Amino acid sequence: MNKIALYCRPGFEKECAAEITDKAGQKEIYGFARVKDNSGYVLFECYQHEDADRLIREIPFRELIFARQMLVVGELLRDLPPEDRVSPIVGMLHGVIERAGDLRVEVPDTNESKELLKFCRKFTVPLRNAMRQEKILQIRENTKRPVIHVFFIAPGCCYVGYSYSHNNSPFYMGIPRLKFPSDAPSRSTLKLEEAFHVFIPYDEWEERLASGLYAVDLGACPGGWTYQLVKRSMMVHAVDNGPMSQSLMDTGQVRHHKVDGFKFEPLVKNIYWLVCDMVEKPAKVTQLMADWLVNGWCREAIFNLKLPMKKRYEEVAHNLQKMNLQLKENGINAQIQAKHLYHDREEITVHVRRIWSAYAASRNND
């Protein structure tokens, strides 16, 4: 198996391909990307047979922006016989993987492929049983073992492979399943909720998304992102010249500042979260977020960057690199993560967590 399959949003295959090619090159692993527009996935074929496994071990999945999932796959299985689709799939895995912890039968996130989902759910049962009999799959689900993926791109045609549970997306098809809350003021609320699921480990939610934390929402109107903070019992400074949802104001947890988000400066020093979803040039938003972090006005930030029409990956990488450099120059140690979320469209979501000042003298102030 010398290929990597990466799931992505349809229409962003070129960005996903540019990113994996760049990341592989940094590891001195070479190959070429196969891209089919609007297919919802990319294949990266390595020149050396063992390099595919090395890539999915060594490239941190959390550092990939446009990939929803990353796995090693073999050659495409075509025209699976309707009377026995199981045997060819199981045969692909003999000698490749044993005692895997989970099985996911998946499809690309396209309208055409969604018709296959019903089949995938039914097919999972006999396939799982066969894999357990062959000891390819453990009897019980084990989150510490590799995950087997069977990726159907058309009826009777699939890629078979695996990912590592410590370096993949834990979600089926790489997509968190979230429901739109009926009392939220806008659908944008799902972007921030998904960001929490993707960027913050569940065992840290009680600390980092705790009741009573103070937050600032820049460009808050009508309150989709503020809603997520209020739902977690935070106190929110909502900054926007436009009107806020009355139901949010009625909670008593929101203070509305009718100010331009680029001009607002907090008067208090107890802000933990900064969130921002403003329609503005990526460089301008990135600079604003860097200023907040350098000034010590927040501990963590989640913000959206609107994507340009061309060279999206290059533009995003440039802005994040510039931000990272600015933080380091100011003695700030931070973790930066970015993801093209399921609920994002022509944008990506970035998470920055300030750890502490790199300068010991400044740490006491953090």
Curated annotation (Swiss-Prot):
Active-site residues, Swiss-Prot/TrEMBL: K306
Enzyme class: transferase
Enzyme Commission code: 2.1.1.186
Pfam families listed in its UniProt record: FtsJ, RlmM_FDX, RLMM_N
Protein's cellular compartments: Cytoplasm
Binding site for S-adenosyl-L-methionine: S188, C221, P222, G223, G224, D240, D260, D277
Keywords attached to this entry: Cytoplasm, Methyltransferase, rRNA processing, S-adenosyl-L-methionine, Transferase
GO MF annotation, one: S-adenosylmethionine-dependent methyltransferase activity
Annotated TM spans: none
GO cellular component terms listed in the entry, alphabetical order: cytoplasm
GO BP annotation list: methylation; rRNA processing
SUPFAM superfamilies found in the cross-reference section: S-adenosyl-L-methionine-dependent methyltransferases
InterPro entries: RlmM_FDX, RlmM_THUMP-like, RNA_MeTrfase_FtsJ_dom, rRNA_MeTrfase_M, SAM-dependent_MTases_sf
Keyword Cytoplasm among record annotations: yes
Quaternary structure, from the entry: Monomer.
Known role: Catalyzes the 2'-O-methylation at nucleotide C2498 in 23S rRNA.
Protein name per its UniProtKB record: Ribosomal RNA large subunit methyltransferase M
Organism: Photorhabdus asymbiotica subsp. asymbiotica (strain ATCC 43949 / 3105-77) (Xenorhabdus luminescens (strain 2))
